[in-house]
């Protein structure tokens, strides 16, 4: 098991009250695979440094989790398939 930090930028048109439940739906991949979600920090709507898909803002969320590399890759893949997710970045903070 490795520690990961996942940053997710969601479409700003998503209702901010539904961000946490939709993240839980994705994070269930980690929980069912034997990993753990250590912390979920929703930053809210922020201005982007540059436009992504003609959007100037996004809803930021940072998730700290512990999982196997395969589970982390599967989570990143599923997030990439969702249209409400503008961008994701998955890193290992202990490796940098």
From Swiss-Prot:
GO terms under cellular component: cytoplasm; ribonucleoprotein complex; ribosome
InterPro entries xref list: Ribosomal_bS6, Ribosomal_bS6_CS, Ribosomal_bS6_sf, Ribosomal_S6_plastid/chlpt, Transl_elong_EF1B/ribsomal_bS6
Keyword Ribosomal protein: yes
Organism: Beutenbergia cavernae (strain ATCC BAA-8 / DSM 12333 / CCUG 43141 / JCM 11478 / NBRC 16432 / NCIMB 13614 / HKI 0122)
UniProt similarity note: Belongs to the bacterial ribosomal protein bS6 family.
Role noted for this protein: Binds together with bS18 to 16S ribosomal RNA.
GO MF annotation: an example: small ribosomal subunit rRNA binding
Name of this protein: Small ribosomal subunit protein bS6
Alphabetical keyword list: Ribonucleoprotein, Ribosomal protein, RNA-binding, rRNA-binding
Keyword rRNA-binding assigned: yes
SUPFAM superfamilies: Ribosomal protein S6 (SSF54995)
GO biological process: translation
Pfam families the UniProt entry points to: Ribosomal_S6
PROSITE patterns linked: RIBOSOMAL_S6
């Amino acid at each position: 098991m490795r520690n990961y930090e996942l940053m997710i930028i969601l479409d700003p048109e998503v209702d901010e009250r539904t961000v946490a439940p939709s993240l839980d739906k994705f994070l269930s991949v980690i929980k069912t695979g034997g990993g753990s979600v250590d912390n979920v920090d929703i930053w809210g709507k922020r201005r982007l440094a540059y436009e992504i898909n003609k959007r100037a803002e996004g809803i930021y969320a940072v998730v700290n989790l512990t999982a196997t590399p395969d589970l982390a890759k599967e989570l990143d893949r599923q997030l990439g398939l969702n249209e409400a997710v503008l961008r994701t970045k998955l890193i290992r903070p202990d490796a940098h």
